[in-house]
């Protein structure tokens, strides 16, 4: 899913503009749209870029998804690793009121921002990582999905069906371990699609390959069609392929 996140960002992204207040005191290249609103002409989901769903401290963690054991170990390490900027803040303000739980990169495990998270329902006294280590993955959170502003509940049936197809595609598709060098390419791809995914010359980078975004999307959507057809047959519908 991490490799395919640009596909989700492009098709479901719904935040090409942001409130001007979010940019106060920050360097940016966003353009004025209307009063109080900034945007980029070819943006898809600025929420998923460096001005939104990001945490610079957490990017240094290098939490890996290649296997569950390493993921759990990396997550637990982050909860006990001090982060100097947080340490400088201290735990209490001048009046003795608490301002943070601790000075660690993650104050609690649920603070970890990521595009996808494996989850297990914790039992009494368990942390999320302990639940994963003890009983494995029960479900997966897909967190790269913008709220649909045209839906009363933030998502429509078509989008839910598409996410079901891509989740099944990711489950069945062979996926090699993700090295740091490729993670850098994935970060570049995500930035490209977030900021200029609707540009005609938007590109996707892979190890030893480069694609126009449109061509890359078509490759994967075409590969998903048999799964969509199978789901259509199973549930007597056509929503998965439409």
What are these regions, as identified by a protein language model?
Residues 1-131, 179-184, 202-209:
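Loop-rich catalytic cores of soluble enzymes, especially ATP-dependent carboxylate-amine ligases
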Residues 7-10, 167-196:
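Flexible helix-coil linker/hinge segments at domain or subdomain boundaries
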Residues 91, 188-242:
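Cationic, histidine-enriched alpha-helical/coil surfaces that engage anionic ligands
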Residues 112, 139-143:
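Structured core elements
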Residues 134-138:
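Core structural elements
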Residues 143-155, 202-210:
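Glycine- and acidic
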């Amino acid at each position: 899913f991490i490799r395919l996140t640009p596909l989700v960002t492009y098709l479901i992204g719904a935040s090409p503009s942001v409130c001007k207040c979010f940019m106060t005191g920050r360097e940016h290249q966003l353009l004025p749209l209307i009063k109080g609103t900034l945007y980029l002409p070819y943006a898809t989901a600025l929420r998923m870029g460096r001005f939104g769903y990001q945490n610079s401290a957490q990017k240094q963690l290098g939490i890996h998804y290649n296997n569950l054991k390493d993921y759990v170990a990396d997550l637990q390490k982050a909860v006990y690793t001090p982060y100097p900027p947080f340490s400088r803040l201290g735990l209490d303000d001048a009046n003795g009121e608490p301002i943070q739980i601790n000075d660690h990169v993650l104050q609690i495990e649920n603070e970890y921002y990521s595009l996808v998270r494996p989850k297990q329902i914790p039992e009494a006294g368990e942390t999320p990582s302990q639940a994963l280590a003890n009983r494995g993955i029960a479900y997966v959170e897909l967190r790269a999905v913008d709220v649909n502003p045209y839906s009363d509940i933030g998502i429509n049936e078509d989008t839910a069906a598409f996410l079901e197809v891509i989740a099944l595609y990711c489950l069945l598709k062979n996926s090699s371990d993700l090295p740091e060098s490729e993670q850098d390419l994935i970060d570049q791809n995500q930035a490209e699609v977030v900021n200029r995914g609707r540009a005609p010359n938007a590109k996707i980078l892979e190890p030893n390959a480069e694609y126009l975004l449109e061509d890359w999307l078509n490759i994967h959507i075409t590969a998903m069609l048999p799964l969509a057809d199978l789901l259509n047959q199973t549930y007597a519908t056509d929503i998965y392929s439409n």
